[in-house]
A protein has these predicted regions:
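Exposed aromatic-hydrophobic patches
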Residues: 70-77
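Bacterial N-terminal signal peptides that target proteins for export
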Residues: 2-11
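Primarily secretory-pathway and cell-envelope proteins
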Residues: 24-47, 99-142
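Acidic, glycine-anchored loop motifs typical of Ca2+
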Residues: 92-98
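Surface-exposed loops/turns
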Residues: 36, 67, 79-80
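N-terminal signal peptide c-region/cleavage motif recognized by signal peptidases
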Residues: 19-20
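A short tyrosine-centered beta-strand micro-motif
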Residues: 83-87
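Short proline/glycine- and polar residue-rich coil/turn motifs
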Residues: 63-69, 130
């Protein structure tokens, strides 16, 4: 005979396992200031200067449906170490960042380390130390 307490313990265990806080326990990026729900949020993770901004050489790529406000991006390949994160809001869903005069982005974009370059972006200025279990917050600029 199974006691009632057994089911309560299983229920509590499942709540803990599937709670949003638990989802943030691994490498996680919180994309803030998403202006609207159109398109996708594209995230590229780079681990060194040589591959930085070479999309086909990014260490990890995540593309997730945009949601107004905040989007949680879980990382599956990396959970700690030195990385640079590049994020853009692909508003029209074409897979490319729209740029204007002097290649200035026309869609929401951001780099890790609150880096807002005035010229060509540099890995060492965008680089951060990703700590296991500590989410990284990045605010999009439009």
């Amino acid at each position: 005979m199974i006691r009632k307490g057994f089911f309560v313990r299983i229920f509590l265990f499942l709540i803990v396992i599937f709670s949003p806080v638990t989802l943030l326990a691994h490498g996680t990026i919180l994309i803030k200031n998403v202006e609207h729900s159109e398109g996708f949020i594209d995230v590229k993770i780079y681990t060194n200067e040589e591959t930085f901004l070479k999309e086909e050489l990014s260490y990890e790529t995540v593309r997730k449906k945009a949601m107004k406000g905040e989007v949680i991006i879980p990382l599956s390949k990396i959970h700690e170490g030195k990385i640079a994160i590049v994020v853009y809001h692909d508003e029209d869903g074409n897979g490319e960042l729209k740029t204007g005069l002097f290649w200035r982005p026309k869609e929401g974009f951001a780099f890790s380390n609150n880096y807002n370059p005035k010229g060509p972006p540099k890995f060492k200025k965008a680089a951060i130390m990703l700590e296991h279990g500590v989410p990284v917050a990045i605010e999009l600029n439009y």
